[in-house]
Amino acid sequence: MTQSSPQNLILVGRVAGAFGVRGELRIATYTEDPLTLTRFKALTRQDGSPALTVQTARVVKDGVVARCAGVDTKEAADALRGLRLYVPRAALPEPDEDEYYLADLIGLPVRHVATDELLGKIKSVQNFGADDLLEIDPALGGQTWYLPFTRAAVPEVKIADGVVLADPPALVGEPEGPESPAEDDDGERHYD
């Protein structure tokens, strides 16, 4: 398989560790069908270099147990724990009209659903254990911020139009709604 640039790679799984003593790997899969991993000629690392070639696999809870070329011992399998597995975007089937891959969101502008204000661009999609979060690079510069990838915070994703519409939740201490704080003579903010 030819190497792909990192931005054209899609994360499809992660080596969770060894399974047994003969070098089989437990792989957590991020595909709808866990056995999809067996359909790819080879899995790569994030930099596009070869990682694993799956020879056989069977479904288990949270993924697959796989036998991979060149991994013949428990120690070799354990050494791969945490390895993220990627495939080129072109190796995946095209999503249906109203579907998309999370990687397709990277780089899309995010606009406020009510005001059409440009909030920023999606830098990455993260998951720290709960729901997915969109990391937003602010339009006006500054530190990136996270937007929950929920129906309430992201009511519309328009892949064909190349835009994500968002209704970010209010920050702690901010008023609800579009009002902005006024400053009094001492420079302190208050809300009317």
Curated annotation (Swiss-Prot):
This protein's UniProt keywords: Chaperone, Cytoplasm, Ribosome biogenesis, rRNA processing
| Residues annotated as domain PRC barrel | 97-172
Has keyword Cytoplasm? yes
Disordered: region residues: 168-192
What's a Pfam family in this record?
RimM
Q: Name one GO molecular function term.
A: ribosome binding
Question: Into which family does the record put it?
Answer: Belongs to the RimM family.
This chain's protein is named Ribosome maturation factor RimM
Organism, scientific name: Caulobacter sp. (strain K31)
The organism's lineage is: Bacteria, Pseudomonadati, Pseudomonadota, Alphaproteobacteria, Caulobacterales
